């Protein structure tokens, strides 16, 4: 069992290293710029004391526009050097050393896609968030050109690894082929099971995953076309969820007396009725006909 866990931890670390390396490419930088623009407008509306980011894509960070008092970056590997104005913590995402109900917002930039146990990470996010806290997710859209390209390179890398085990798989792929892409619908279902309400789902980066910066600049018109037409599938999506906590409202009992049957006294206490019958002599509790017969 220990060997199995160590194997998955090694795969997760390897995936994050490859993702971080991919974000230094021209395509990665173009996507990162779109993700920062999508987050900046959102973070300006998030207030509180503590903001946590699980996973780091580059040394610039994604919390530049945050208005929270404290920002923390939690990673599962060696942190990026010279990350400005953020405190670092290296730990496992499945067991966060954070108190319950102590974080106002959590950012997960593709975190669920490159971790072995996304369900446990979501449970940890639900645990550390305060009531009405925000969870912000960035993800790749599997039903887009990015998803098809990811699947293609995933299969190609698998075949290449069988033929040449010494060749690094990320040398072949123009985008991070590791990990498992999670659709908006699946993530929404997971969050609703944990008691979250979905506030916002937006999409970004409608251009295909082309490694050439020149071609990406020429296809800049696809961004506006995708936002207005709603036909082109976007490469990435932003999902915002709010943690809801149900509370019990105590209801004060209402005491009142109700009218009962003649000869009995009815008392109603907190909705419970009780008939109090008088202790009558059986000889007096006879009908009129029976009394006449006895008199004769």
Residue ranges and their predicted role:
Residues 214, 220-296:
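C-terminal lobe and adjacent flexible extensions of AdoMet/dcAdoMet transferase-like proteins
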Residues 152, 177-201:
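Short alpha-helix
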Residues 197-222:
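Conserved catalytic loop of SAM-dependent methyltransferase domains
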Residues 94-106:
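A short acidic, Gly/Pro-enriched loop at the edge of an enzyme's catalytic core
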Residues 119-134:
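A short glycine-rich, Lys/Arg-flanked "PGG" loop and its adjoining helix->strand segment in the class I
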Residues 2-45:
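Class I SAM-dependent methyltransferase Rossmann-like catalytic core
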Residues 37, 41-96:
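Class I SAM-dependent methyltransferase SAM/SAH-binding core
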């Amino acid at each position: 069992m220990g060997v199995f866990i160590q194997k998955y931890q090694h795969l997760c670390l390897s995936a994050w290293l490859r993702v971080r390396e991919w974000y230094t490419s021209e395509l990665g930088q173009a996507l990162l710029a779109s993700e920062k623009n999508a987050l900046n407008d959102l973070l300006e509306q998030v207030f509180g004391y503590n903001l946590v980011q699980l996973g780091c894509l580059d040394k610039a960070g994604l919390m530049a526009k945050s208005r929270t008092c404290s920002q923390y970056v939690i990673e599962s590997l060696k942190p990026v050097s010279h990350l400005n104005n953020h405190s670092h913590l290296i730990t496992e995402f499945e067991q966060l050393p954070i108190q319950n109900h102590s974080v106002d917002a959590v950012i997960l930039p593709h975190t669920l896609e490159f971790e072995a146990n996304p369900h446990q990470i979501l449970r940890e996010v639900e645990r550390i968030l305060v009531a009405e806290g925000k969870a912000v997710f960035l993800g790749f859209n599997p039903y887009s050109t990015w998803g098809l390209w990811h699947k293609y390179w995933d299969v190609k890398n698998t075949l290449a690894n069988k033929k040449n085990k010494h060749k690094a798989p990320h040398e072949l792929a123009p985008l991070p082929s590791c990990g498992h892409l999670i659709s908006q619908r699946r993530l929404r279902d997971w969050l609703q099971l944990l008691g979250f309400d979905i506030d916002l789902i937006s999409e970004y980066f409608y251009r295909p995953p082309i490694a050439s910066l020149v071609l990406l600049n020429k296809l800049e018109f696809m961004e506006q076309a995708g936002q207005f037409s709603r036909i082109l599938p976007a490469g990435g999506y932003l999902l915002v969820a709010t943690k809801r906590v149900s509370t019990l409202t105590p209801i004060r009992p209402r005491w009142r007396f109700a009218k009962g049957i003649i000869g009995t006294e009815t008392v109603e206490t907190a909705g419970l009725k009780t008939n109090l019958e008088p202790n009558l002599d059986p000889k007096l509790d006879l009908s009129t006909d029976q009394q006449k017969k006895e008199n004769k």
